[in-house]
C-alpha cells in the first residue's frame, strides 16, 4: 500500500486508499481503523508496558490476540450489541480486551479501576454485561458474584 504523508491540508487523506475496500462510508470504525494500522505499521510496536516486566506487542501480534479474543467472545455467546465490561490497570491486556470486544461487535462498558468494589458491582448490575474482564487483583472478588456476567 502506498504511504501518504500527513500534511496540515490533508491529515486524513491516507484513508482514501482504503475507502471502499477496508471500510465503506466516510470514516472507518475502530476495528477497521486498527486493521488499516496493521497494514501500515504491522511489525512496529503497538502496545508496550515497562513494569513490572517489559512487554511489547507489534500491531500484527496485537491483531492476532484481538481476533482470538473476539472469536472466544462469540463462542461464549456474545453477540452484536451485547455489553462486555472491562476494568483493570493500564496494560496490553486491557487494550486487547477493549479491542476484542469491539471486533466481536459488542458494546464496551469501561469501568474505572479506581472505583470501590461495591461501586463496580452497582455498575455491573446496571450494565448487565455478558462478560466482565477484570485483572487478577479483583478476579476473586467478582468471580463469585452473581449478576455480573461471565468473569
Task: Label the predicted regions.
Residues 1-28:
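Flexible, non-catalytic linker and terminal segments flanking ANL/adenylate-forming cores
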Residues 31, 63-66, 139:
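Hydrophobic face of alpha-helices
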Residues 26, 43-99, 116-121:
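Conserved AMP-binding/adenylate-forming core of the ANL superfamily
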Residues 18-20, 33, 54-55, 81-83, ...:
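A short, structure-level motif marking secondary-structure boundaries and short turns
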Residues 1, 75-76, 103-151:
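Structural core segment of the AMP-binding/adenylate-forming
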Residues 7-15, 33-58:
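AMP-dependent adenylate-forming
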Residues 22-26, 61, 109-111:
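Short, flexible loop segments at the rims of nucleotide/cofactor-binding pockets, characterized by
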Amino acid at each position: 500500500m502506498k504511504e501518504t504523508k500527513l500534511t496540515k491540508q490533508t491529515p486524513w487523506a491516507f484513508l482514501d486508499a482504503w475507502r471502499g475496500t477496508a471500510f465503506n462510508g466516510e470514516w472507518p470504525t475502530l476495528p477497521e481503523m486498527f486493521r488499516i494500522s496493521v497494514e501500515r505499521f504491522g511489525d512496529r510496536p503497538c502496545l508496550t508496558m515497562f513494569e513490572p516486566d517489559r512487554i511489547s506487542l507489534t500491531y500484527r501480534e496485537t491483531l492476532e490476540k484481538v481476533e482470538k479474543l473476539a472469536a472466544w467472545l462469540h463462542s461464549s455467546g456474545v453477540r452484536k450489541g451485547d455489553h462486555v465490561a472491562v476494568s483493570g490497570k493500564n496494560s496490553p491486556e486491557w487494550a486487547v480486551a477493549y479491542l476484542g470486544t469491539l471486533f466481536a461487535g459488542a458494546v464496551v462498558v469501561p469501568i474505572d479501576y479506581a472505583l470501590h468494589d461495591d461501586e463496580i458491582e452497582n455498575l455491573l448490575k446496571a450494565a448487565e454485561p455478558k462478560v466482565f474482564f477484570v485483572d487478577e487483583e479483583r478476579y476473586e472478588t467478582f468471580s463469585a458474584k452473581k449478576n455480573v456476567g461471565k468473569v
